[in-house]
């Protein structure tokens, strides 16, 4: 807020990332209120949160929390081909600016394969309530079981003051005698489980 106050006439757009790669969600409502108080729009890089609208078990989506626009990478958490993404807005002024810029900078030869994949993905999401319910039920079951591990810790909402995406299974090895990368290696070689990412702890 200090930056917005100091540069009130210069800052027209604030960009934040939420959720993080690990699933932590920012307080978008408070951030959007601060931005709007100073005349700035809020764009959220919601790349890892494209699935949020499809279950109450997930955090609320950015546009519902006051963001003016959001970028969603469908391919990260939904069934869509790599490179597919959406830029969404509920702000008419931004919508006009986006349309004008797309007319200038967008390719005249878009990939119909990727656009078709987006359509297929959106159709799946609109007609798969049962699948999302089952997915969230499985996530909660797995998370409850992982809480019983003696030396490995699974992160959840109780570990942060912010909202958290239960779809991110983040496990800490800080209290174990192996590193995160070593655990990933064991899971891969011994159990054929491939982790998406591994850090030192």
Where are the language model's segments positioned?
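Conserved PLP-enzyme active-site core in the AAT-like
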Residues: 1-156
